[in-house]
């Protein structure tokens, strides 16, 4: 999230791995970034309507879920929060397609960019930009 901080009024990050949150906080401090807040935990336990109310409705959400994709309760909260844009990064195009179908009524795909981060393997990262309808 730190790479976006200069273009945003506020960054709120949620990550399952507590050590990654510790690193993000250190990187924010080292780079003089003061508009970030980070929370450790599983998205389906952390992200709810109260979390959105406490942290503000997002303009943009960047999703990078595990291989299993985004849990339905998380998608429901995202749809209620209604950000203008969603950037969905996925290592599993099948679960990404499933999740995109669940958001299709509220969002349209504006851009898709596969990224070959693991040459000579079948693995690909897929980045999709969604905009609210």
What is each model feature region?
Residues 1-133:
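Rossmann-like S-adenosyl-L-methionine
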